[in-house]
Amino acid sequence: MSDIRLDSATFFKRAAKIFDSWEKPSGDTQALEDINSIAIILGDPNDEVASYTKTTALQLWLLGYEFPSTLMVFEKSPRKVTFVCGSSKAKLIRQLQPSDGIEIDVKVRSKDATAAKETMEEVVASLNGKFGSLPKDRPIGKLVDEWNSAVESKSDLEVVDVAIPISAVLAEKDGEELKTIITSAKLTSTVMINYFKSKMESIIDRGTKMSHEALAQLVEEKIGNEEKGPDMKLWNKNPSLGEIDFASSEFVYSPVIQSGGKYDLKVTAASNNDNLKPGIILANMGIRYKNYCSNMGRTFLISPSKKQETQYTTLLEVRKEALALLKTGAVASDVYNSVHQSLETKNATLADSFLKNLGFATGMEYRDSSFLLNAKNNRELKENMVLVLTIGVADLPDAKNKGKTYSLLLSDTVKIGQNGAVVLTEGCTRLSDVVMDMEEEEEEDVKPQIDKKPKINNSPKKPRSSTVGGRVLNAKTRGANREQATQTTAEKIKTNQQRLHAQLNADGVKRWEADAGGKNGAQQKVVKRYESYRREEQLPRAVEDRRIYVDEQRQSVVLPINGYAVPYHISTIKNVTKTEESNHMVLRINFQSPGQIAGKKEDMPFEDPDANFIRSVSFRSQDQRHMLKVYEAITALKKAAVKRETERKELADVIEQEKLIEVKGRHPYVLKNVFPRPGPEGKKTDGNVEIHQNGIRFRPDGPASKIDILFSNIKHLFFQPSEKELIVIIHVHLKAPIMLGKKKTSDVQFYREVADMSFDETGGKKRRARYGDEDEIEQEQEDRKRRAELDKLFHDFARRIETAAQAQQFELEVDVPFRELGFNGVPHKSIVALLPTTNCLIHISELPFTVITLSEVEIVHLERVQFGLKNFDMVFVLQDLKKPPVHINSIPVAHLDNVKEWLDSCDVPISEGPVNLSWPAIMKTVNEDPHAFYAEGGWNFLTGSGSDDGSEESEEGSEFEGDSDVFDESSGSDEDSESAFEGDSDSASAESLSDEGEDWDELERKAKRADEKHRTDRGGDSDDDGKKKKKGSRR
């Protein structure tokens, strides 16, 4: 304690405030008028006594620290403060020297009982008549017993409760106090909006089972504890929280999370062990920073009824009125009555369930019980008071769940001002911010009566995660409602897309505003300087022969020009050509120079492009052998230089990871017998994956190199179950690529084959004779069981990785693909199944992998969308305009509506056109001046009717259209064969099969023709075959 320094200036300033209110009592301090002294005593620490009391708050307010077992006695005239405490505390308090007319007396309480009693009797003897105290705080301890005994022994003393006057003194905050409370409020709102909301949505969306208490603990850990520090990734989302002292931060109480029909709106409520459930979810949390408290409470509505949305909107209106009424001079009871009367006018049912108070004053004491915003409190509000405003209704009957009730709550920390209250914990109050729609509820709401008149929703777009399950609902609309529902969905998509495109343009202009007029807003190309030889003496002796000399060590070519040896670095040479003439050979060396039509993606920068350049130089010689040798040497040197530069650029983004820290004191969690892809040595190697302190490690069984992946470098973590696959996968997508062997990779996955490949070699006759054999049925059951066990094993391990990463303050969540939203396409060279996840579009079943992060996508353009074509293409333009767009070709047109609906639900801007565009030319134009591009309309040109300008390919189709017919007709994948008979399928519904189906003879003839065509084309798998079929299919 010797390093503790008390702030004397703050103590005397605030003590003077107490004496000033005491000497000139009025209003709330009127009770001090006849009092000669005030005794404030803090007893021994006790868990049973509330931690937030006026005694503790007063000590912290004056001294900055809590001093247990300490008595403070204020005497009015002359102004004097007497402290009675132990010797160690007395040394600290003696730092306060008398100042500003306030005398300080420090009495040391002896450990001897008799001496301690005499000291206390001496202090009590100085008291006369009435003295103020805080009896409701109920302190305990030896010091308290000695004090009570001494007071009782003096019969002429009368105790007066001064809770209200002390509350009034503490209520009005100065500038430093307000600054601290605002920081506390920012901490609370940041953890509520940026962590709890998204975490809760993720749990509900995925159907994860997690108790209220467990979720509250996750929230509480974000502030840090003794084992680990604060989650800076979360707090850095609010720039104003970058440099605060988290050691001075703590939760006022463990966050209170309630759902499932059990709600308690009292201050004493706590989270229970029930699992978080959809419906109405209440969340309350408060953070204390440098002893000042703040609080925030929100209601989240999961698939609410129209009535619940209306009720919540009503509460928002009442909240707005309450904020206007909470101003300097207003009486607390009048505010409550006005708000209650307003609610009664709007909705009498809600008024009957309205809470008995609107909140309370807060500060160093979390809840000032002497200042409640209720109908009985006639105290006036003062400027710069800070309140917790709570608008809530309790125990409303739930129409959807008979016998159950629900509650609605909005709670904020507010500051009183001249013209109303200012909300310090603003955010996440609008209906669109708190509503999350689930699939089941939307299915129930699809009724003929409603569908006849499309629902108009003027609220902004729902959060992205709220629509994961709702993207395919239109395919489930039955009968006469199908067309109407599809039309309604199209209208919603159109409205949302107009908003997204407007926002995209506005953000683009703002993003590139600082670079207006500049070129591409990126770093200018650096001119590289090469120095072959610093001094003439370094030239090789061979140049004395005045012949062309290739110096491989210096990466230079020395040319004899006018009798001088002139060296040229290989980077300045573009290429070399040779021409044979009868008995001569001409060697022509072409140099790099500006203005050439090189057809390269990057032009070589020059210091002065306007200078005079030598384009080429020619040498003619009869020594053909020497000239050929020089030609080959220059060519080889150029190839080596180009290769080195290519490798350098390719490895420029590869990072050197930090060292993996292995867990100590226990064995790491292990997933055994898995295969990595790509392999560490380019070969298939099995081994184990281990979870360590700051990352995961693949430890091979053989001599191959181990693979370390740090949590800090993991961008996405995917788990793909074995459904319709032969393997189960844990896939890691990295932020920056790493080296595996001699190749770089941004994706590493660990998989295990579901079962060894087995073949039934039984003849056809025997198979028909034993159809339904019990052995085969048992084998299928075992296979399903084995798949389920393997899926659970990998999923649990992925969850362990997520937990370990979150323990190291990394925001990492396991993402599982939605197979029902999947579609086929060609991201590379073959048709594969592409599966959406919560945040990405992926293909990870086989190499090469495809992982597209939707948050990094600027716009998605759909190409070749026109009547008569079976396929369309999709182009992802990334926010990093320097990166080339990602193409996915040959997507069956049957998936067009679902793809649009999925992208729209993820708030991704979409455009479409009838032809393929020349994207290299488009991106070159965009990068030349991004600000001008966005200022002139940005990507709006894509949303027009489209034209043939910039078209690279004709309307017949993209590279893989020739293969797609064969794929559609003869592919034997599980996905295609099953989807043809699904009742929900867009391409072949039950109605279409019954109304327009062909007979078996016709189907058999078509299958025979397809087989013959398949054999003729040799399967149609290679690129060459595909091109041949494409060419032959044109008419």
Curated annotation (Swiss-Prot):
It comes from the Eukaryota. One of its GO terms (biological process) is positive regulation of RNA polymerase II transcription preinitiation complex assembly. This is FACT complex subunit SPT16. Keywords: Chromosome, Coiled coil, DNA damage, DNA repair, DNA replication, Nucleus, Transcription, Transcription regulation. Residues 949-985, 993-1002 have a biased composition (Acidic residues). It comes from Cryptococcus neoformans var. neoformans serotype D (strain B-3501A). Residues 440-471, 944-1035 are annotated as: Disordered. The keyword DNA-binding does not apply. Gene3D superfamilies: 2.30.29.150, Creatinase/methionine aminopeptidase superfamily, Creatinase/prolidase N-terminal domain, FACT complex subunit Spt16p/Cdc68p, Pleckstrin-homology domain (PH domain)/Phosphotyrosine-binding domain (PTB). One of its GO terms (cellular component) is FACT complex. It is found in: Nucleus; Chromosome. InterPro entries: Creatin/AminoP/Spt16_N (IPR029149), Creatinase/aminopeptidase-like (IPR036005), FACT-SPT16_Nlobe (IPR029148), Fact-SPT16_PH (IPR056595), FACT_SPT16_C (IPR048969), FACT_SPT16_M (IPR013953), Pept_M24 (IPR000994), PH-like_dom_sf (IPR011993). GO terms for molecular function: histone binding; histone chaperone activity; nucleosome binding. Residues 1003-1027 have a biased composition (Basic and acidic residues). It holds the Pfam family SPT16_C. Its main location: nucleus. Forms a stable heterodimer with POB3. The SPT16-POB3 dimer weakly associates with multiple molecules of NHP6 to form the FACT complex. Belongs to the peptidase M24 family. SPT16 subfamily. Residues 637-657 form a coiled coil. Component of the FACT complex, a general chromatin factor that acts to reorganize nucleosomes. The FACT complex is involved in multiple processes that require DNA as a template such as mRNA elongation, DNA replication and DNA repair. During transcription elongation the FACT complex acts as a histone chaperone that both destabilizes and restores nucleosomal structure. The lineage of its organism: Eukaryota, Fungi, Dikarya, Basidiomycota, Agaricomycotina.
